[in-house]
Every structure is written in structure tokens, then in C-alpha cells.
Amino acid sequence: MSEPIDWLPDGTPFNPRFGDRYHSHTGLAQAREVFLRGCGLPGAWAGQAMWRVLETGFGCGLNFLATWAAWRADPARPRLLHFVSCEAFPVSADDLLRSMQGHGELEPLARALHAQYWGLLPGVHRLAFEGGQVLLTLYIGDAQAMLRQQQPVADAVYLDGFSPQVNPELWDVHTLKAVARCCRRGTRLATWSVAGAVREGLAQCGFRVQKVPGLPPKRSNLQAEFDPAWEPRPVQPELPDVRVAGGPSSVLVIGGGLSGAAVAASLARRGWQVRVLDQGAEPAAGASGLPAGVFAPHVSPDDSLLSRLSRCGVRATLQALEASGLSEGEDWSACGVLEHEVDGKHRLPPAWAGDAAVGAEWSRPADAAALEAAGLPGATVAYWHARGGWLRPARLVRALLAHPGIHWQGRSAVARLEPVAAPGGATHWQAYGSDGTVLAEAPHVVVAAGYGSRPWLPARYPIHPLRGQVSWGTRADSPAAAWPPFPVNGHGNLVPHAGTAGGGIWVMGSTFERGQTELPPAPQEQAQAHAANAAKLEQLLPALAQGLAPAIAGPGAAPGHWAAVRCTAPDRLPFVGPVDAARQAGLWVCAAMGARGLTLSQLCGELLAARMMGEPLPVEVRLARALSTERLPAD
């Protein structure tokens, strides 16, 4: 449930829980005076590659929108603006948009924020704007707890929230200590509150504080700088600090599929010069060449780690698709996905059961209309994933690789990687082809070649092959089939309609053949795969299976076939991070997506880039830890 708010006669939003307004009718002017000017912005970020703002109370997003507008208007702006904001009680997207009606210049930005402001369950949510150059990371939960957990580094701090009289926990010394732990020496802080307890708390935490004249009707504001008289004790992070020295440079990415393209795009947006070495004659020649596939969140009664990761992944995938320039309906669609629990077990968290429940914007019990559209009985156990959909991964790969900072180099199978001495005492990596020629050289290499990543990873990386075969055909060849209007997953999955050529294609599968690497599969194995896929469809969508049977197993049937080898780890989670930071500096990995590459690859690319650049993480730190290479035992 979103936080209910009231509206005062002057049109400003008011929170009945705290008995305080979010901002006054002069809110935009106050935001600029108190927070931007108080932190020396936009001047302070001039010439910087990245700027990180931390805010303690998001409210209706006014300070974020004002900062974004200042970034857009500044020709000396940083390439990347991070805005991290805490919010325990998020308002609805519609109320957020309504609150900006008096600030016309912000309304286009507010509409963009409104479009992404959904599904804000407790935890961390990354929203992306301006092609990924403005990143809003929302910490939904208690500010003190979230800051202690995430430990983002801030260049500027907006200390904001409801009055200390009505919300003292947000201003107490414990929260201020959590804020201070996120500051570097020289970080500037600004707030509208001049309460004595706030001034004393900031001073106690190492800030030099001064009271300055305010913009009427405010008499005074506070400005501060983190400059403790002591040397701050280093915080022990949950994840090791592996940021690269010197900022963006050049990097080689081995692999031209979804993982490699996601990493390449994330780094290129940050100013890296990226060269993708791909053994294929064209991008996405391996497992990412799937004709079409489903992306959807995972659900579990305890809202497991994988469930939380998958939601972050779906959000990142949608952001990539929306920014890609691809055609919705032809190349992808966020049409929703029906999940049929063929074993009849209930897997949705109990608190998510109602339409108004906290998780309903993500997943909820399927209604009668959805079940009827899929040809399933009304008593079927099934869920509707409102933010799921389908995509044609090869087209997304090509769109990602089109960034001007990326050079794709095909027919470039890497046979050997070697560290070499570079000028200035640095170490570079050289990639050699099978004939011994140097394909490319760079200070950093990211291995993102799926199962082909094995030669570059130590033996302690337990990755295994997982061959998958799908069946596909054109809708025109099966006019009698009872097609659902949306993808369905569960035991296998079906994309009923992808693209428009020839009426569109359908795709179903996939097999999970552990240990199998032979490509293409033998004819007998292909026939067995078609039979296995048809058997899954019989359980998943019995009505459709009956109508589609002639195209799969009827006389003269010749269903389309596609196969590839995926890569998976024993815990079914990808590896994202340095391969061996102590002994192989500059070598990174982003691989082992398993069967969830469409859902997780974009998130993993952003996570790797964030770790390489020392940025706020796009996920909860415990989720990042679960994906990290540091989870592996040392040699």
C-alpha cells in the first residue's frame, strides 16, 4: 500500500501520519536554495565524471527533480549523476505526479519519474533516466538501517524529512552517524532544519556546521562539511572495494551475447572505451540467439533471495528495452506473463494475495479473465506477473552494442589471455587468437562468454553446461490453435506471438540437458526435444497443446528447432565481479546466467560496472554478495 496523503487548500501535499506537509507552495525555490545552493551545486560537480547525492527523505521527489533539472541545464555536468534517497513510506505514483502540478518546468521530468515509480517493495530499487546517465536509487525502509546496510559514498547530502518534532528518528544522532559513514572528507551537507539537536548531532559526527540566511519565509538554513578532527575509522564493507584506479579507460569484453552486451553498454555509458571480442560472425550467435523468450519475476512464499533478485532484474531489463529504440510489439513487449503452477502448489507470499496487497504491482493471483484467455479452468493455481513480458534477445544485443563507445569485433575467438607490462608500470591484458596474433589489448578484461568462459576462470569456479532446445513455428501454420494473448510459464514456457512477419512466430520450450554440449544436437535428440517440449505444453496449456499438436507431431510436421548451451553455477546464480583481485588484477567475470539470462543479464552488467566504478549498488548489498565472485571459497 502507498502512503495516503491529503491535499491542503493551496494544493500542497500533507502527510496525516506525521501531521506535516511534504513541501510548501514555494517548494521548488526552497529546494534550490536549501539543498542545491547549500551543497554548492551545480558548481561543485563541474568537471567531475560522476556525482553522488544522498538524501534522507524522498517524499514526493521534489529535491531529486530539482537536481535532475539542474544537471540537464548545466553544460559542465558530470557524465553520471547518482541520486540515492531513503523513504520509509513511499507515496503513490499518481500523488507524486499531482504534487508537481505547480512546478511546470519539472512536469516532464515528473512524468518520466511517474512512469518508473511502481512496485516499491522494501529494499533497493534502481530507476534510470537520460539513457542511464541519471540514476535514482531508492532505499525503501528505515533510513538508518538502509544506510548502515548499503554504505553508499556521497559527494553531497540532502538532510531532509518531516520535522524533527514529528519524526525524531530521522534526525537523531544514530541516523546522523549512519549518514556520516557515507561521507568522504569534504562532503557537503545541507538542511532546512536549524534545530539545536540537529546542529549538535552533526558536530558530534564530524561535520563543521554553520547557520546561513534562508529564503523567506525560512529565516535560516544549515550548511555543513564533513571534516572530522579525527581520522574516521574505516568501515568494513559487506563487499570488498574493488573499484579501478583512475576511472574509465579501455576494456575488452569477451563474448557478444546478452551478458557481454550488457556489460559493454553499462561501461560505455560511464565513459569506457569498450572492445567486444566475439567468436561469432555476428552478435548473439550463441545462447542469446534464442528466437524469443520470457522475462518474469520469480516468486516464493518466503520472498527468497532469488525472488528479490529477479524483480531487480526485470526492472533493469525493462529499462534497457525502453531505452533501446527497439519496437515494442515487434521486438519485445511488457504485456504481462501468466505463471501456471502445474503442481498446484501456492508460491506467492501470503501477504500478496489481494489486489491492493504490497506486491500486487509485481505478481498477484491470476483472475478469471486471464485463466479463461489461457484456456485454463477457473480453479487453476496461477499468477499474473504484471511486469513480465517477452523479448527477442538478439535484437536487444545489437541495440546495446550500437553505443558509440563500443567496437564489436567478430570472428575473434580468444585462444589465450596474458598479462603484459605496460608503460608506467601498469599491467595490461593481451588477447591472442588461435594463430598467435594479438587480437586486442587493454588494462581490463571482462569474461562474459557463457560456457565459453571456462578457459579464463580458475578451477574453483564451478560452471556447468546446460543445453536447451526449443520448438518454434509461425502462427499462420496453426490457425486452429487456441493462442493465449500473453506468454505463459511454469513447467516450460510459451511465447505465443513474437513479431509480425508472417503473422508472427511462437516459441516453446525449453529442455534442460545438464552436461550436454554437442551442437547441433543429433536428429534423434532434436526429435526427442520436440516431444519433451510438447509434453510440457500439454501440462502448461492443455487446450493450446491439442490445437498445436499437428504442427509439432502431425504427419509431415516440421517444427522449427533451435538449440544452444547455457552456463550455470551450482547455486543457480551468476558470477559477477573480479576473477581473482589479488592475483589477476584487471580480470573480471559476468557469466553463468543459466536459464535466466533474459531476466538477469542487464542487472548483472550494471552491478559489475558499479563495483568497478565505486558507485552505489543497484541492489541490496546482500543480493550483490550472493552474485559476487567473493562468495567462492579461496584457493
UniProtKB/Swiss-Prot annotation:
Write the Enzyme Commission number(s) for this entry: 2.1.1.61, 1.5.-.-
- Could you tell me which residues belong to the region FAD-dependent cmnm(5)s(2)U34 oxidoreductase? 254-635
List localization entries. Cytoplasm
Q: Supply one GO BP term.
A: tRNA wobble base modification
Q: Say yes or no: keyword Transferase present.
A: yes
Query: What is the required cofactor set for this protein?
Result: FAD
Region feature (tRNA (mnm(5)s(2)U34)-methyltransferase): 1-227
Task: Read off the InterPro entries from this record.
Answer: FAD-dep_OxRdtase (IPR006076), FAD/NAD-bd_sf (IPR036188), MnmC-like_methylTransf (IPR008471), SAM-dependent_MTases_sf (IPR029063), tRNA_MAMT_biosynth_bifunc_MnmC (IPR023032), tRNA_MNMC2 (IPR047785), tRNA_S-uridine_synth_MnmC_C (IPR017610)
Recorded GO terms, molecular function?
Answer: flavin adenine dinucleotide binding; oxidoreductase activity, acting on the CH-NH group of donors; tRNA (5-methylaminomethyl-2-thiouridylate)(34)-methyltransferase activity
Superkingdom of the organism of origin: Bacteria
Alphabetically list the UniProt keywords.
Cytoplasm, FAD, Flavoprotein, Methyltransferase, Multifunctional enzyme, Oxidoreductase, S-adenosyl-L-methionine, Transferase, tRNA processing
**What is one cellular component GO term in this UniProt entry?**
cytoplasm
Enzymatic reactions: 5-aminomethyl-2-thiouridine(34) in tRNA + S-adenosyl-L-methionine = 5-methylaminomethyl-2-thiouridine(34) in tRNA + S-adenosyl-L-homocysteine + H(+)
Family per record: In the N-terminal section; belongs to the methyltransferase superfamily. tRNA (mnm(5)s(2)U34)-methyltransferase family. In the C-terminal section; belongs to the DAO family.
Tell me the PANTHER family matching this sequence.
SARCOSINE DEHYDROGENASE-RELATED, TRNA 5-METHYLAMINOMETHYL-2-THIOURIDINE BIOSYNTHESIS BIFUNCTIONAL PROTEIN MNMC
What is this protein's function per UniProt? Answer: Catalyzes the last two steps in the biosynthesis of 5-methylaminomethyl-2-thiouridine (mnm(5)s(2)U) at the wobble position (U34) in tRNA. Catalyzes the FAD-dependent demodification of cmnm(5)s(2)U34 to nm(5)s(2)U34, followed by the transfer of a methyl group from S-adenosyl-L-methionine to nm(5)s(2)U34, to form mnm(5)s(2)U34.
Listed name of the protein? tRNA 5-methylaminomethyl-2-thiouridine biosynthesis bifunctional protein MnmC
Q: What organism is this sequence from?
A: Paracidovorax citrulli (strain AAC00-1) (Acidovorax citrulli)
